[in-house]
């Protein structure tokens, strides 16, 4: 009885290690590809026509900040979210 329990536990342990290694291998390829993916996404979000400051960028007035951002009224002055979505900002 004890031998069969030990064999069962050993088989389960080997199966766990085997599936964990296979899963790690699958996720490893995602990690290798992620820098290239992030670099390509960075190009998508960069805009040559953007003359505004992004979130937490320094500012002196609301018009310095991008859409849906406003200049913080107290020091330190930087762009913060103005709690609007879509085309709500007037």
Curated annotation (Swiss-Prot):
Residues excised as propeptide: 23-50, 86-90
Gene Ontology terms: cellular component: extracellular region
Pfam families according to UniProt: Toxin_12
Keywords: Amidation, Cardiotoxin, Disulfide bond, Ion channel impairing toxin, Neurotoxin, Secreted, Signal, Toxin, Voltage-gated sodium channel impairing toxin
Signal sequence interval, chain numbering: 1-22
Top-level lineage group: Eukaryota
Residues bearing PTM Phenylalanine amide: 85
Annotated S-S bridges: 52-66, 59-71, 65-79
GO molecular function, one term: ion channel inhibitor activity
Primary localization class, coarse: secreted
Tissue expression pattern: Expressed by the venom gland.
Official protein name in the record: Mu-theraphotoxin-Phlo1b
Subcellular location: Secreted
Function: Gating-modifier toxin that inhibits voltage-gated sodium channel Nav by shifting the threshold for channel activation to more positive potentials. This toxin moderately inhibits human Nav1.7/SCN9A (IC(50)=360 nM) and weakly inhibits hNav1.2/SCN2A (37% inhibition at 1 uM peptide) and hNav1.5/SCN5A (<20% inhibition at 1 uM peptide). Inhibition of Nav1.7 is voltage-dependent, with lower inhibition at more positive test pulses.
Entry similarity comment: Belongs to the neurotoxin 10 (Hwtx-1) family. 39 (Jztx-34) subfamily.
Organism this protein belongs to: Phlogius sp. (Tarantula spider)
């Amino acid at each position: 009885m004890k031998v069969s329990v030990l064999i069962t536990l050993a088989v389960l342990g080997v199966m766990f290690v085997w599936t964990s290694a296979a899963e790690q291998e699958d996720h490893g390829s995602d990690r290798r590809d992620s820098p290239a993916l992030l670099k390509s996404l960075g190009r998508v979000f960069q805009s040559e026509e953007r003359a505004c400051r992004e979130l937490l960028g320094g500012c002196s007035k609301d018009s310095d900040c991008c859409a849906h951002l406003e200049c913080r009224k107290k020091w330190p002055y930087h762009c913060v979210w103005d709690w609007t979505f879509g085309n709500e900002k007037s």
